[in-house]
UniProtKB/Swiss-Prot annotation:
Organism: Carboxydothermus hydrogenoformans (strain ATCC BAA-161 / DSM 6008 / Z-2901)
Positions that bind GTP 2: 183-190, 230-234, 295-298
Assembly: Associates with the 50S ribosomal subunit.
HAMAP family xrefs: GTPase_Der
GO MF annotation list: ATP hydrolysis activity; GTP binding; ribosome binding
GO biological process: ribosome biogenesis
Record-annotated KH-like domain positions: 353-437
InterPro entries: AAA+_ATPase (IPR003593), G_ENGA (IPR031166), GTP-bd (IPR006073), GTPase_Der (IPR016484), KH_dom-like (IPR032859), KH_dom-like_a/b (IPR015946), P-loop_NTPase (IPR027417), Small_GTP-bd (IPR005225)
Keywords, ordered alphabetically: GTP-binding, Nucleotide-binding, Repeat, Ribosome biogenesis
Protein name as catalogued: GTPase Der
Entry's family note: Belongs to the TRAFAC class TrmE-Era-EngA-EngB-Septin-like GTPase superfamily. EngA (Der) GTPase family.
Binding site for GTP 1: 10-17, 57-61, 119-122
Length: 440
């Protein structure tokens, strides 16, 4: 039995994301005074009284003909269908609007249990005058809270728990592979996530930057759990002026750091850009598993050698990621998405691979005999032995006589030898030099 699902819905700027963040205890949804800053469904696991449930934060409901608004409304309808319980958040200071009335009408039709949450009540013994208008929505007694300062949120969670059915034993028996989907704006990240999920869960538009939040979306593929992190497209920080966009960029960086495997999405039409290089550098720096995903491959005129030429172009521009596999896909047509998930499994396995010390040192000795390390000012570098000290990424300690004698080119040689013998496809390798109790 799966965990129960609670969805937070309401019109823009009533405090849904603030309540979401208050419940889960982290700043995951972007909170801003600008209406409509949460466009997509955000998923997070929440716990109260030892009970675990999934919490969904949705974009603000607005009933207009605007393209993004229409798509957001579709997202919310899907969230309502998925939810076991709905928290309908209203602004107790502003009172009822026509949008509130329209949302309430839809919720009454849904036949789902609803808690009407009256937000922005700092003193629930003396609520704002407009608080009492909320009774007119026909959804029962408004529950007063202040998401900003936490007033009455604990009591709200008590009520939530009382209305949910929980499995007797919930065990996370399968480790979850965390996948960050990263890239510049409008290269098809959201379309790729939706294609993998088989539904439109992330707002997709031709307008660059329509995904503002890093959205954690659970999925199952061939009986295994994954967590997809669809990040806001990263722009150069120098071009970002609004606090909202700057926070989105920082969130994208955090998404890379949280991931096991990063999918670097590149547009087949545009090729590798300077911004792609910067994002690739972040993935490499943080030591994540990485797959280079060339999207929109269906739009390219091809011959028998097009893919090989394109791969050469990628490795020329991203020379430091030559260990990363390249796959050509189309989120629009679904081309090679099964192969992509197979690659994710393979890179995840390599990212956490561990090599026995005895085998590692046998390969190391052969490498040193075949190509001895160069001497520096007459002093030879001696490598005594190696051992693997970490995974995610695989990290090796090399015990030497003098760490300053190790040239970066020889470390690169050893890295290539380790890859030839042990694989490590799609993952950074790191080396730590140790000598006489010192670490460098």
């Amino acid at each position: 039995m799966k965990k129960p699902v609670v969805a937070i819905v309401g019109r823009p700027n009533v405090g849904k994301s603030t309540l979401f963040n208050r419940i889960i205890g982290e700043r995951i949804a972007i909170v801003e005074d600008t209406p409509g800053v949460t466009r997509d469904r955000l998923y997070s696991e929440a716990e109260w009284q030892g009970k675990v449930f999934d919490l969904i934060d949705t974009g603000g409901l607005e009933f207009s003909e605007d393209l993004i608004t229409t798509k957001v409304r579709e997202q919310i309808e899907k969230a309502i269908n998925e939810a076991d319980l709905i928290l309908f958040v209203c602004d107790s200071r502003e009172g009822i609007t026509s949008t509130d009335e329209a949302v309430a009408k839809n919720l009454r039709k849904s036949d789902k249990p609803v808690i009407l949450v009256a937000n922005k009540v700092d003193d629930y013994l003396n609520p704002p005058a407009n608080f009492y208008d909320l009774y007119r929505l026909g959804l029962g007694e408004p529950f007063p809270v202040s998401a900003a300062n936490g007033t009455n949120v604990g009591d709200l969670l008590d009520l939530v728990i009382s209305k949910l059915n929980f499995p007797e034993d919930y065990e996370d028996e399968n480790p979850v592979v965390k996948i960050a989907v990263v890239g510049r704006p409008n290269v098809g990240k959201s379309s790729l996530v939706n294609a993998l999920l088989g539904e439109e869960r992330v707002v997709v538009s031709d307008i660059p930057g329509t995904t503002r939040d890093a959205i954690d979306t659970p999925m199952w593929y061939q009986g295994k759990p994954y967590l997809l992190i669809d990040t806001a497209g990263m722009r150069r920080k120098s071009r970002i002026e609004e606090d909202l966009e700057r926070y989105s960029v920082n969130r994208s960086i955090k998404a890379i750091r949280r991931a096991d495997v990063a999918l670097l999405v590149i547009s087949a039409e545009e090729g590798v850009t300077e911004q792609d290089k910067k994002i690739a550098g972040l993935i490499h720096e943080y030591g994540r598993g990485v797959i280079i995903v060339v999207n929109k491959w269906d739009l390219i005129e091809k011959d028998a050698k097009t893919a090989d030429r394109y791969k050469e172009h990628i490795y020329f521009e991203l020379g430091f990621l030559k260990y990363a596999p390249v796959i050509f896909v189309s989120a629009k047509t679904g081309q090679r998405l099964n192969k992509l998930m197979e690659l994710v499994d393979r890179v995840s396995f390599e990212h956490q691979k561990r090599v026995a010390t005895s085998i590692l040192n046998q390969v190391l000795r052969e490498a040193v005999v075949l190509n001895p390390p160069p001497a520096d000012r007459g002093r030879p570098l001696k490598i005594y032995y190696a051992t693997q000290i970490e995974t995610k990424p695989p990290t090796f300690a090399l015990f030497v006589n003098d760490a300053e004698l190790m040239h970066f080119s020889y470390l690169r040689y050893l890295e290539n030898v380790f890859r030839q013998n042990f694989g490590f496809e799609g993952t950074t390798l790191k080396f730590v030099l140790r000598e006489r109790g010192r670490t460098t």
